[in-house]
């Protein structure tokens, strides 16, 4: 039942988000602005978030004028709360990473709610840093972010504009730096 519900909701997300995503993707054909607004999404717990921090330095080295927002779970926000490469920190109680029971529909209600909030951020680029996080890819799609980067792992791939190949045996830090 849960699997069928997810497939149906993923289909609805694609259909509902299509007009906004198409309009956002047309914007993506233009070069990034000089000071792009970038959103990084990493829902994981402490260890995986620590392994992602080299990405922050690499991103700021490549785009020093970028405004970088990072969205993490409240359980790991202290890891990057004072990181010099982050201009803004957002927290989200990502489904699948929270402990305790949650309703069958609750993750999808949260998806729409957070996507609406992210639309106000007017991001030029978003990077989903967790390889198998379809919810994050769908979030970026519904938020109408023009350039959505993540790993080519189903069922999240259709929500991305740039799907990167994923190599499972690769160390998490190296994978994130790609």
Residue ranges and their predicted role:
Residues 1-178:
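Catalytic machinery of carbohydrate-active enzymes
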């Amino acid at each position: 039942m849960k699997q069928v519900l997810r497939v149906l909701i993923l289909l609805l997300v694609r259909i509902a988000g299509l007009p906004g995503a198409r309009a956002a993707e047309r914007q993506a054909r233009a070069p990034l602005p000089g000071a792009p607004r970038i959103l990084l999404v990493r829902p994981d717990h402490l260890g995986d978030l620590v392994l992602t921090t080299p990405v922050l330095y690499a991103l700021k080295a490549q785009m020093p004028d970028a405004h970088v927002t990072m969205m993490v779970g409240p359980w790991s926000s202290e890891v990057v709360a004072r990181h010099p490469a982050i201009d803004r920190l957002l927290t989200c109680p990502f489904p699948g990473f929270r402990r305790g029971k949650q309703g069958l529909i609750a993750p999808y209600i949260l998806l729409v709610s957070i996507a609406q909030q992210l639309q106000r951020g007017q991001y030029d680029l978003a990077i989903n840093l967790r390889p198998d996080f379809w919810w994050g890819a769908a979030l970026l799609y519904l938020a109408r972010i023009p350039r959505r980067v993540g790993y080519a792992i189903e069922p999240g791939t259709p929500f991305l504009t740039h799907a990167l190949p994923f190599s499972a045996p690769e160390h998490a830090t190296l994978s994130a730096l790609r």
